[in-house]
Amino acid sequence: MGLGNLCSYKQDDSLDILQKKVLIDAFNKVTIDGKPNVQHQQPTYWYPPPPPRHHKEHKKSHHHWEYSSDDDSSDDEESCEKKKPKCCEKKKPKCCESEQNNGCGRRNQLARRLAFLGSFGDGDCDGCNEAFTVTGPITYFRTCPDPLTGITPAVAAAAATPAAAATPATPAAAATPAAPAA
């Protein structure tokens, strides 16, 4: 399963640990209004995964990264099952995607980061290859998965490239001396 665009990221086990770390490191460098984005920074380790809260929950969702580090008591299975139909009837794709594919709203760490980045776009989650900028030196792209491999190019590639040095301003041309008056 490919990454899809940032808004509709789904689990892709073909991403290796290094690729995941690159994405997270890039995310952690994002700044808001010139200040480090501490609010959304997360540790960059991936293994071992956090222990499941409930074994039943783990078997239900069938993937490895459904657990949030947040202890949200309102996000239990019962309340989520009640919310899910109403959410999807209203056709809120982010809500439905997170509840159906991430263990009842529990996004894995990478998905939560990419969803956050996607929120800085134009709000159209099915746009592809659209550049959008988070305040700071990095421009992120919504990219579509490669049609052959199904894997989306690393969205954080720009983060690995040092910011281009500012081009020095061209010196103003020397004023031509005025011709002597006749």
From Swiss-Prot:
Region listing for Disordered, in residue ranges: 33-103, 163-182
Q: Name one GO biological process term.
A: ascospore wall assembly
One Gene Ontology cellular component annotation?
Answer: cytoplasm
Q: Which domain of life is it from?
A: Eukaryota
Q: What do mutants without this gene show?
A: Fibrillar structures absent from spore coat. Increased rate of spore wall collapse during germination. Spores sensitive to thermal stress, ethanol, and cell wall degrading enzymes. Normal rate of spore formation resulting in spores of a normal size.
Q: Which UniProt keywords apply?
A: Cytoplasm, Sporulation
Subcellular locations according to the entry:
Spore coat; Cytoplasm
Biased composition (Basic and acidic residues) is annotated at: 80-97
What PTM annotation applies here?
Palmitoylated by the erf2-erf4 complex.
One Gene Ontology molecular-function label: structural constituent of ascospore wall
Q: Where is the composition biased (Acidic residues)?
A: 68-79
Q: Where is the composition biased (Basic residues)?
A: 52-63
- Main role? Forms fibrillar structures on the spore surface that contribute to spore wall integrity.
Tell me the protein's name. Answer: Spore wall structural constituent isp3
Source species: Schizosaccharomyces pombe (strain 972 / ATCC 24843) (Fission yeast)
Gene (UniProt): isp3
